[in-house]
Amino acid sequence: MRNSFIRNGFIAAGAVNILAVLVLSRAFTNRVIPETDPEVMSNFGLLMIAVWGLAFLAVANRYRSVKWLVGAFVVEKLIYATVWFRWLTTHDLAAVYAKDLFAGVFYSAYGLNDFSFFLFFAAVFYQLHQAEKVPNNHAINR
């Protein structure tokens, strides 16, 4: 993957985390999201999702020097995607939509988003790992 694509991927991951939380939670005033899954999506949990977004933005131009942080991003996204899948298979999404459209959209999309960025971060981590195997080689195209 080219450097510009990867940089833009980190920016997109950060922007989606921050903007989706702020918009769909209506700046943390939407009670349906935290009531629907208080263990994971409390207002504090939503705030932490935005903080992860800040971390993604912070490394967009420096990801090559923080391979293991990218690895942590892989784990974070895998956990959220797995939790979402478990939630989706044990809850009634239509009932969430009936209570609040924004909450329904949030619970419909967050796991797909996290799984997509899990794949992206995993590919970046793999590319960084491969680049370390070849001395004096920059496997990531500029």
Which sequence ranges carry the predicted segments?
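Short, charged juxtamembrane terminal tails flanking transmembrane helices
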Residues: 1, 129-142
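Cytosolic juxtamembrane helix and N-cap/initiation of the first transmembrane helix
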Residues: 1-17
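Short juxtamembrane and helix-loop transition motifs at transmembrane-helix boundaries
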Residues: 2-7, 28-38
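Core segments of alpha-helical transmembrane spans in multipass integral membrane proteins
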Residues: 15-19, 39-61, 75-82, 112
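Mid-chain, well-packed structural core segment of small domains
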Residues: 64-93
